[in-house]
Amino acid sequence: MNRTLQPDRGASQTAPAAHQARAFAPASVANVAVGFDLLGYPMDQVGDTVTVRRIDTPQVRIAAIRGIAQPLPLQTERNTAGAALLSMHRDLALPFGFELEIDKGIPLSSGMGGSAASCVAALLAANALLEEPLRREHLYRYALDGEAVASGSRHGDNLGPLFLGGLVLCTLERLVPVTVPAAWHSLLVHPDTLLETRRAREVLKDPYLLPDIVTQSANLALVLAGCYHGDAELVRAGLRDVLIEPRRAPLIAGFTAAQQAALQADAMGASISGAGPSVFAWFQTRSAAEAAAPAVRAAFTAAGFDSQAWVTPLISPGARLL
């Protein structure tokens, strides 16, 4: 499966096909235990949809935000989708503007990449309205500016998977697709509670010990090697977080029990999705992931939270025009 960055359809057009476009971007799992701010993949069963209209006034404005994540700022500079389009608009010095409407399907502060989804969907839709649409790696730079509004830092682990699909290694300069066996699936469980990204980052400020950093680096190497070779035992040996999870786990009621439930169901590994509170786990088959879901959800029920669960292949599609 070729997941290298490609120009969008219509990139050679000399005039926009329409004055309105819509795009969908799915939820995503970021960090993946061993790749803090570096590694992520999409979960395409839930996501955000953004409609962008081309307007004569050279400005970016948000007309409406609807859906399950409320309230979110309508001020362009304070909204990830708006900030990303502002970055594009200023960089290209466009003589026209954009008006956008955001339909949120991803819960707020869920660790499911909601800010990234709105951001990428907005960029894809706006890009379709340009006389000469840009390649997706160019859009990635604008998306990084948008994501910084939500978390206070530029990081691409939620963004890259939405541009490429599948498991992606994301630096600030490039996106690298990671080969994964088609049979491997991810379980994602979201408890009905909030954990703000900025708060989750605050607990990471204290220094880390060098031996822990070395261990985490080795774990990342094991996971990447296991993915490329299709070796579940390598992944099982490496898919554990010794840096971020120990500091964030106390912020998530029920996390430890949920993680143990997944591991007892033969998960290759389980940890916090993004900043949390959602939890992900990797399995070698869809049936194993589906069988584990009730026990993981039960752990959050015992902690006092309702929850939702989704199962998707690790090789899932990213954002797309509608």
Curated annotation (Swiss-Prot):
One Pfam match: GHMP_kinases_C
UniProt GO cellular component terms: cytoplasm
InterPro entries from the UniProt entry: GHMP_kinase_C_dom, GHMP_kinase_C_sf, GHMP_kinase_N_dom, Homoserine_kinase, Ribosomal_Su5_D2-typ_SF, Ribsml_uS5_D2-typ_fold_subgr
EC numbers on record: 2.7.1.39
Main localization of the protein described in the UniProt heading: cytoplasm
Entry GO MF terms: ATP binding; homoserine kinase activity
Keyword Lipid biosynthesis set for record: no
Keywords, ordered alphabetically: Amino-acid biosynthesis, ATP-binding, Cytoplasm, Kinase, Nucleotide-binding, Threonine biosynthesis, Transferase
Keyword Transferase: yes
Binding site for ATP: P107, L108, S109, S110, G111, M112, G113, G114, S115, A116, A117
Localization per Swiss-Prot or TrEMBL: Cytoplasm
Family: Belongs to the GHMP kinase family. Homoserine kinase subfamily.
HAMAP family associated with the record: Homoser_kinase
Biological role stated in the UniProt entry: Catalyzes the ATP-dependent phosphorylation of L-homoserine to L-homoserine phosphate.
Name of the protein this chain belongs to: Homoserine kinase
The species this protein was found in: Xylella fastidiosa (strain 9a5c)
